[in-house]
Regions:
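N-terminal FAD cofactor-binding segment of flavoenzymes
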Residues: 43-84
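Conserved N-terminal helical subregion
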Residues: 70-160, 167-172
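Glycine-rich Rossmann-fold phosphate-binding loop(s) that bind the pyrophosphate
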Residues: 12-14
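Extreme N-terminal starter segment of soluble prokaryotic enzymes
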Residues: 2-8
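Flavin-dependent oxidoreductases
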Residues: 172-186
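Short alpha-helical segment within the catalytic ATP-binding CA
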Residues: 18
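Glycine-rich FAD pyrophosphate-binding loop
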Residues: 8-10, 21-46
Length: 186
């Protein structure tokens, strides 16, 4: 292990796991660590909407086909604003030309299914190691690079004066609750 670069990833949610899978393509050792156990990381009551841009990324790492059995696609999306009473309906005909033949606008996946697929994938790599912070500390590994995937306002980054690189976009993102109505196919 001494002749390879050592990467440490703090935070083993979807971002940390996907980062470890991406870095695993290089000749390096990747040490994933989190305060939560694997079971606790998987067992969260969350759901994600997957867009076509995310689908493309997952496909590059051969994860899309592994996730497909757990995805629920939707071909129309109704967006309404309860304050202004405005609404709009989107369908597959509203997709960009490069993905206009797609049957779905997007997909929904449970957090636990996504995490199970990601953890199963990292188990296939001999250069990715998932450890508790205490066990990792006892190994006394000198890390060449450290990544924190513990959230935007993580205390981890603030405590160790970590360089936090952010990119501002001229777009905004809204978080909202979704009500799923109608026929849902797998």
């Amino acid at each position: 292990m001494n002749d390879k670069l050592n990467f440490k990833i703090v935070g083993s949610g979807p971002t940390g796991l996907l980062l470890s899978i991406a870095l695993s393509k290089f000749d390096c050792n990747i040490f994933l660590t989190d305060l939560l156990t694997k079971d606790r990381l998987i067992d969260k009551d969350k759901t994600y909407a997957i867009t076509h841009s995310t689908r493309k990324i997952l496909s590059k790492f051969r994860l899309w086909e592994k996730l497909e059995p757990f995805l629920f696609g939707f071909d129309t999306l109704s967006i309404s604003d309860s304050v202004t009473s405005a609404f709009t309906n989107l369908s597959t005909s509203d997709l960009d030309d490069d993905i206009s033949s797609a049957e779905n606008i997007g997909w929904v996946v449970k957090h636990s299914d996504l995490m199970n697929v990601f953890f199963q994938e990292i188990d296939n790599y001999e250069n990715i190691f998932f450890m508790t912070p205490q066990r990792l500390l006892r190994k006394k590994i000198l890390f060449d690079y450290q990544f924190f995937s513990t959230g935007a306002n993580s205390l981890d980054k603030k405590f160790i004066d970590f360089v936090d690189i952010k990119k501002s976009y001229s777009q905004s993102c809204l978080t909202f609750k979704v009500s799923l109505r109608g026929h849902c196919e797998k």
